[in-house]
Design a protein with these regions (language model features):
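Two-component/phosphorelay signaling modules centered on CheY-like receiver
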Residues: 10-28
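Hydrophobic/aromatic residues positioned on beta-strands within the core alpha/beta folds
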Residues: 78-80
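Acidic, metal-coordinating helix/loop segments flanking the phosphotransfer/catalytic sites
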Residues: 29-47
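C-terminal output helix
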Residues: 103-112
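Active-site residues of response regulator receiver
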Residues: 51
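The feature encodes the CheY-like receiver
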Residues: 55
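Acidic catalytic/metal-coordinating carboxylates
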Residues: 32, 58-62
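Alpha4 helix (beta4-alpha4-beta5 surface) of REC/receiver domains from two-component response regulators
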Residues: 61, 83-99, 110
Length: 120
């Protein structure tokens, strides 16, 4: 599975990528919204984990832009946020899921495993 991790915390993004690669996935990293959009225009991802708080804007706006692009319309996009109050709110409707930080290794492994299951 091809996974993109978008997080402005370099150490977190790199750790997520290392875990994914250790589980046999291909992992790429972007640290801001512009880089994420650029990566998605160059290749197709099966899963994008997208931080809400990015230095160049809101991850929700990046998600909306990705949903409009031909490259990521059907890609599973999961929000990463430190704000527990955002999980389940209507402003997160473009996302396929939401995980509240901090994320445990087990939660990341579970998410990657679930993303490999075809959607119904």
């Amino acid at each position: 599975m091809n996974v993109l991790f978008v997080d402005d915390h370099v150490a977190c993004a790199d750790m997520f990528a290392d875990i994914a690669e250790g589980l046999g996935h291909r992992a790429c990293v972007a640290h801001d919204g512009v880089s994420a959009l650029q990566r998605c225009s160059e290749e197709t991802f099966d899963l994008i984990l997208l931080d809400i708080g990015l230095p160049d804007g809101d991850g929700r706006d990046v998600c909306c832009e990705l949903r409009r692009s031909a490259h990521a319309q059907k890609t599973r996009i999961v929000a990463l946020t430190g704000h527990v109050d955002l999980k389940g709110s209507s402003c997160m409707s473009d996302f396929d899921g939401c995980i509240v930080k901090p994320i445990t290794m087990q939660a990341l492994e579970d998410l990657l495993g679930a993303a490999m299951t075809p959607s119904v």
